[in-house]
């Protein structure tokens, strides 16, 4: 049994030692390479800052190198804040470039248009002009018309099938600058912008309206900006970063991308606005790859740049734009028809058939595709219907929006049988006709129309086709349709879908064996050259936690230096914005970015300060680690992996750290209060003496109460033992207290103080003068206290008497000195007073004399002036005499 007890004691001791020396505590690390997803605004950087849309972007120095990270991260091109911001920002630029400012609602009136032109372009058709369709037995044209750079029809705009531009001249009457008089105006419209009523065949004019009048109020652009492409890149604010999936197998969604790189800015991109195709993209490679939506069949296909696919569009004619003043403040841009120009058109260059064939082969190999493997059954098709931007290929050419009918192009690429098509569509050509609209449907927000003033002159634009927007549908493995799409937003998912915006979280929590932070001798290191960039410390993101923790000082310094550098660049841009009268979408983003960066840094420092770890790279605390079973593998785990493991503990640890810091501050406050005892002068402070007196009174009262309690306890103990105190009164003062005894009990004999009588009564003594005794003892105690206090005060007086005498003598000497100085001051003041009085008298006499002289001079001058007429009269009298 004894051996078992010894073993149990040894086990308890070992457990106690283990609990003392093996407990782990929370340690705060600042500068760890970790991050989390973010949704804050990005800002732009560009080399070409002389265009209207990029004046407020940061200058692009091209130094945006990428660092490879040994981590695994998830990427999604559709659920992505970078692509969503790009779509919204480009839309804002698009809307700003054609921002309306003049209401054209007065033009929603009846216009008289040339009937022959309205009949020609299919707006009206009387009963006498109806023509029958061509007979089915007519020969079908299957001619393949191809054009290239050397074709003569390109320069002359007379390639086969191209017609004149569909323009109609109209007249309307309304009030002009003179509101009480009407005026007739002439205006030229595109046929697609008008809607006409069916008129009589004898009329020479058709009644037409603007086709927007039944939907909304159109406004005309009043600035000189046109929607031209803008090249720029997105950059993350300080404290944030952009991760990119560098895996060639990435197809728009990858939950575990192992090839991750980090940078502060994206690649350069262009503001594309077109349907069906993407132009001048930056993602083209020597391969064809597909971004496929994770939940439906929306795709964006990047075309192989090896095939050199191009599209060149042209709007022929020397168009003239004439502003027409409708009324005060309203100007409408008119287009007088000098001669009938050819319609706009586009032709396609490059190996398009080979490119489309490779697209089909890539679709077959894609893991999401489960349709037919026969590429002959995969067809490129046009959408069935909808808005013009869907049924036509819609693009912008230097401010003019072209709507191109793509039947000829699809027939040529797919080698279709054209015998069953309409007469005008029975051709295989590598060029397509286009028509122009001035009233367009916007691509980002539904139901809003804008009016664009046309550009003058001959317009030509050349583009490189880099992507294809399509929906891929298949049925039971028989047929697969690649239906061209009008989702303009998909272009930016291809451009930026491999990026991901993250917020750098440099504060990490991990358990260590050190309980508190101890400061040792610090050595001042020489300042080294700043080599790492703002994101340099993320290079250790794939390293183990132990290795990354060894460079926290340099990493945190790099983080702060990068924030300061980017803040200075943003500040320069904000200063330049003060000179601008009009801000683009980048103006507010730059301001938001600056505020976001400052807020993030201050937030991190405030959090560290709340834990008592401000401006420390490694901060040990007194908070025990809450989960002993969860510890990091310092040699294998990365900080990003560790942050994911302890994410559920972060809130609890944060609360414990704050509570520990509050307790630490309370302890420091109490410690600071004790520091006042180090100063000898504080001992003579009046407030301190009052405290000392209070403490003395408390001690005296405590001693008195303690003595009384001890005495009472001793007295009660002796009374319970049956002994009479030695200071009790003599027997004559005893008062017998009779008690009734049970007759059946035997009588006690031999009891001290008892006569041995065997009756039923007995008595025991009680001190009747006990109160007198207490009073005498209290008087003695008070006398002792009085004598001691008197002795203390007399000795204090004896000690303080020489000090008071010296102080009195010093005060007397000071008084004598002050009285002497006061006498000197009084004498000096009297002398100064007399001098001032003498000066005043002298100045008064001088001024009085000067005033008399001045008055005499003025009086003589006045008399002389008044005597001038008299002298003149006297002179004339002498002359006449």
From Swiss-Prot:
Segments for region (V1): 113-169
V4: annotated span: 404-434
Start and end residues of each stretch annotated as Disordered: 737-761
Signal sequence segment: 1-19
Organism per entry: Simian immunodeficiency virus (isolate Mm251)
GO BP annotations listed: membrane fusion involved in viral entry into host cell; symbiont entry into host cell; virion attachment to host cell
Disulfide bond sites: 44-57, 101-222, 108-213, 113-170, 235-265, 245-257, 313-346, 397-461, 404-434
Protein name as catalogued: Envelope glycoprotein gp160
Site (Cleavage): 527-528
Pfam (any one): GP41
Residues with site note (In-frame UAG termination codon): 736
An example molecular function term from Gene Ontology annotations: structural molecule activity
């Amino acid at each position: 049994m004894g051996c078992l007890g010894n073993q149990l004691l040894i086990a308890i001791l070992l457990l106690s030692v283990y609990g003392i020396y093996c407990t782990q505590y929370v340690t705060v690390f600042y500068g760890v390479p970790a991050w989390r997803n973010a949704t804050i605004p990005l800002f732009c950087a560009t080399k070409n800052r002389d265009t209207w849309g990029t004046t407020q972007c940061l200058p692009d120095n091209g130094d945006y190198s990428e660092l490879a990270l040994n981590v695994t991260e998830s990427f999604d091109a559709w659920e992505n804040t970078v692509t969503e911001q790009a779509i919204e920002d480009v839309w804002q630029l698009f809307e700003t470039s054609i921002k309306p400012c003049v209401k054209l609602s007065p033009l929603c009136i009846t216009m008289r248009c040339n009937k022959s032109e309205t009949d020609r372009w299919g707006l009206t058709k009387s009963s006498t002009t109806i023509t029958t369709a061509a007979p089915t037995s007519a020969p079908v044209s299957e001619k393949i018309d191809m054009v290239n750079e050397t074709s003569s029809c390109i320069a002359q705009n007379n390639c086969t099938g191209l017609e004149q531009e569909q323009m109609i001249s109209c007249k309307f009457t309304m009030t002009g600058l003179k509101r009480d008089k009407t005026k007739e105006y002439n205006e030229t419209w595109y046929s697609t912008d008008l809607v006409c009523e069916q008129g009589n065949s004898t009329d020479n004019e058709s009644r037409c309206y603007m086709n927007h009048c039944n939907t909304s109020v159109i406004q005309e652009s009043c600035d000189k900006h046109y929607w031209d492409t803008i090249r720029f890149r997105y950059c993350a604010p300080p404290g944030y970063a952009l991760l990119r999936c560098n895996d060639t197998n990435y197809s728009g969604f990858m939950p575990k991308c192992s090839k991750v790189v980090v940078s502060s800015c994206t690649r350069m991109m262009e503001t594309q606005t077109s349907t069906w195709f993407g132009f001048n993209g930056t993602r083209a490679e020597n391969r064809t790859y597909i971004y496929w939506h994770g939940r439906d069949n929306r795709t964006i296909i990047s075309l192989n740049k090896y095939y050199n696919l191009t599209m060149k569009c042209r709007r022929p004619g020397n168009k003239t734009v004439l502003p027409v003043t409708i009324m005060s403040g309203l100007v409408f841009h008119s287009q007088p028809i000098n001669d009938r120009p050819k319609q706009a058109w586009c032709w396609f260059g490059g190996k398009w058939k080979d490119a489309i064939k490779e697209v089909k082969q890539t679709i077959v190999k894609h893991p999401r595709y489960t349709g037919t493997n026969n590429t002959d059954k995969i067809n490129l098709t046009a959408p069935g219907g909808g808005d013009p931007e869907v049924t036509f290929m819609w693009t912008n050419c230097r401010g003019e929006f072209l709507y191109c009918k793509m039947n000829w192009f699809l027939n040529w690429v797919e080698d279709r049988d054209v015998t069953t098509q309409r007469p005008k569509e029975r051709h295989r050509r590598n060029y397509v006709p286009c028509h122009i609209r001035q009233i367009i449907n916007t691509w980002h927000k539904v139901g809003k129309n804008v009016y664009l003033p046309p550009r003058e002159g001959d317009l030509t634009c050349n583009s490189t086709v880099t992507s294809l927007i399509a929906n891929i549908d298949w049925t039971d493995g028989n047929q697969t349709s690649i239906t061209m799409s009008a989702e303009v937003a998909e272009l930016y998912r291809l451009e930026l879908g491999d990026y991901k915006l993250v917020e750098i979280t440099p504060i990490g929590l991990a358990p260590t064996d050190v309980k508190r932070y101890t400061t040792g001798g610090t050595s001042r290191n020489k300042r080294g050259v700043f080599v790492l960039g703002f994101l340099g410390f993320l290079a250790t993101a794939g390293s183990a936690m132990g290795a990354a923790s060894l460079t926290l000082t340099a990493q945190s310094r790099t983080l702060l230096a990068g924030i300061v550098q980017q803040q200075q660049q943003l500040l320069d841009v904000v200063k330049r914005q003060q000179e601008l009268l009009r801000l683009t979408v980048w103006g507010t983003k730059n301001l938001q970015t600056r505020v976001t960066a400052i807020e993030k840094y201050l937030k991190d420092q405030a959090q560290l300060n709340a834990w008592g770890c401000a401006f420390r790279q490694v901060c040990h605390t007194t908070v025990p680690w809450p989960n002993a079973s969860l510890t990091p593998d310092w040699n294998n785990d990365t900080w990003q992996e560790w942050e994911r493991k302890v994410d559920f503990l972060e809130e609890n640890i944060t609360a414990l750290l704050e509570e520990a810091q509050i307790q630490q501050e309370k302890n420091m406050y109490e410690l600071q209060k004790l520091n006042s005892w180090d100063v000898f002068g504080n001992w003579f402070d009046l407030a301190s003496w009052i405290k000392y007196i209070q403490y003395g009174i408390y001690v005296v009262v405590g001693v008195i109460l303690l003595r009384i309690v001890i005495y009472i306890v001793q007295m009660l103990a002796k009374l319970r033992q049956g002994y009479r105190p030695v200071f009790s009164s003599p027997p004559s003062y005893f008062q017998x207290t009779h008690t009734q005894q049970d007759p059946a009990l035997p009588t006690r004999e031999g009891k001290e103080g008892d006569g041995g009588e065997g009756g039923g009564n007995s008595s025991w003594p009680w001190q009747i003068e006990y109160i007198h005794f207490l009073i005498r003892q209290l008087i003695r105690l008070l006398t002792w206290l009085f004598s001691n206090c008197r002795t203390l005060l007399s000795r204090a007086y004896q000690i303080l008497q020489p000090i008071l005498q010296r102080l009195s003598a010093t005060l007397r000497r000071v008084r004598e000195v002050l009285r002497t100085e006061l006498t000197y001051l009084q004498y000096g003041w009297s002398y100064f007073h007399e001098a001032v009085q003498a000066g005043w008298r002298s100045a008064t006499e001088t001024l009085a004399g000067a005033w008399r002289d001045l008055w005499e001079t003025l009086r003589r001058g006045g008399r002389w002036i008044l005597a001038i007429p008299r002298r003149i009269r006297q002179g004339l009298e002498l002359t006449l005499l």
